[in-house]
Regions:
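Cell wall/extracellular polymer interaction/catalysis modules
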Residues: 1-110, 120-145
Length: 145
């Protein structure tokens, strides 16, 4: 088994009870990163940054039950379905307002984790995984690495 495959399998296993967002800088000048969000044995592509202060700071965050909301704005929708989940940093930072959400409209975010879905089904699946976990557990740990 390759090292990359072993590492990916371990991240998937570790993401059963938390979200792990792993990114790589793709454009340091524009502070743009691309990555994979791992959660509950699933993987979803995302981007972070390109605008404002750029990609999300690495670290630990928390999301809370009751904060996952439907959104109608184009920048929070893909395939006609929009939502967002605010993230609270668990470390000292001057950044605020970071969220998980579909990356609708013009590609890029102000630092949020902007998810890129292949279909409406994938978008709804991610939303439902987050909703169901938060309904059961009240708090979701999120790590950006």
């Amino acid at each position: 088994m390759s090292l990359f495959k072993e590492e990916t399998e371990q991240i998937i296993k570790d993401s059963e009870d938390r979200v792990i967002c792993r990114y790589t800088l793709t454009d340091n000048l524009n502070k743009y990163a691309e990555g994979i969000l791992y959660f509950s044995n699933e993987m979803f592509k995302f981007i972070s940054g390109k605008y404002g202060n750029g990609y999300a700071p690495k670290g630990k965050y928390k999301a809370y039950s009751g904060q996952l909301k439907h959104r109608q704005e184009n920048s929070y929708q893909q395939f006609g379905f929009g939502w967002c989940l605010p993230l609270g940093a668990q470390f000292e930072t001057d950044r605020s307002g970071l969220m998980l959400h579909p990356d609708g409209g013009v590609e890029g975010t102000l630092g949020c984790i902007g998810l890129h879905f292949e279909s409406l089904d994938e978008n709804v699946k991610c939303y439902n995984l987050l909703r169901d976990y938060l309904d059961k557990s009240n708090i979701l740990n999120v790590e950006i690495v």
